[in-house]
Amino acid sequence: MTQTDSLPGVQATVQDMGERARRAARVLRSLPTGRKVQALRALAAELRAREAGILAANAQDVQAAEAAGLPAPLVDRLRLSAGALAAIARDVEAVAALPDPVGEQTDEKTLPSGIRVSQRRVPLGVLGVIYESRPNVTVDVAALALMSGNAAILRGGKETVNSNAALEDAIHAALNREGLPADAVQVIRDPDRARMLELLRLDESVDAIIPRGGAGLHRFCVENATVPVIVGGIGVVHIYLDGSFVQTPQDVQIAAALIRNAKTQKPSACNALDTLLIDRAALAALPDVVRPLLESGVEVRADAEAQAALAGAGLNVTSAQLGDYGTEFLALVASLRTVSGLDEALDFIAERGGHTDVILTRDPAQAERFVQDVDSAAVMVNVSPRFNDGGQLGLGAEVAISTQKLHARGPMGLRELTTSKWVVRGEGQVRD
């Protein structure tokens, strides 16, 4: 008896989805690039044609979420607008315009035995993607999976059941129009947690599980899956403001604008600023850096030294507690910590970083040391951490931002959804 046999009434449905996804993956595996491009263009067209229905379904989800008293960041991630849906359609078209990694040949060589070997890039197979209140993920995953030759089984949160159903209908319409199996992308519409549990254990059909959500979701997937899990999307984002970056009024303005963007442009995003580390040599500029945050409604929680520097300029902020460092806020909250220089900043980030970490500096040596020493999925110099995003890094879209080192790290675009196989050709050689 398998573990999933203990879930009566669940296994047959989800197992059937897995079997159908596996059959669809065989079709997608050898699909020419042109067919995949046409399917994505058809999907973008369906999203535009079905705008009213999709937004109406999403409005139902938003209304239910607000009535249930869900936190504002969760509702924010759930909400779609006409502009957001148009952007999602453009993202699909952007994926269609990307180079297709499938079939790429590498490491071609002829060995002394006369055999000719190479590695060929191939799809992973069937992806299981589990996420919370982000309906855009449904389309992002569909587009990336199709373009990379993978099938996908999606399990969104119960908050998105109506939105995801409408989006799945659009995806299936596009696939049917192009003569491709609709089973290439399937959404588990039943919000019962048992459905998710079985997906995690569907190792006979699913090749990888990719969770997108909070730490609790990632932990649940890792602890319960028999399918390999790619963990990511959670982590504390740091910016270290070096003293060399506040030597001119212009640089102070740049730092203030960048830090404000990092925190307020989309505070519910996983790549939004959580902790600002300020070099003691930069404390004189701190009021000019923090004032725009306060004006934007950010609650700043600072250590005593930073508090004193701000109080001297008439700015009052909350006292930071130990738990405020190492916390992913996903809201208009940021912690602030004074450090004695780069060494202390690196030690601090080493204990709490891993997602996206930024240095603001005019010292090239400091910048290079930061890039070399910080062990995170993305390390940035003089740029907002909000750029750690598949679309912003030229991937078109992303399934997730992986913070682990196997199988992929950072935003997972097309290439990260493939693996390789060895191709060996010969003329009848046998091994001695």
Curated annotation (Swiss-Prot):
Its EC number is 1.2.1.41. Disulfide bonds: none annotated. One of its GO terms (molecular function) is glutamate-5-semialdehyde dehydrogenase activity. Keywords: Amino-acid biosynthesis, Cytoplasm, NADP, Oxidoreductase, Proline biosynthesis. It catalyses: L-glutamate 5-semialdehyde + phosphate + NADP(+) = L-glutamyl 5-phosphate + NADPH + H(+). GO terms for biological process: L-proline biosynthetic process. PROSITE patterns: PROA (PS01223). One of its GO terms (cellular component) is cytoplasm. It comes from the Bacteria. Belongs to the gamma-glutamyl phosphate reductase family. HAMAP family: ProA. This is Gamma-glutamyl phosphate reductase. The gene is proA.
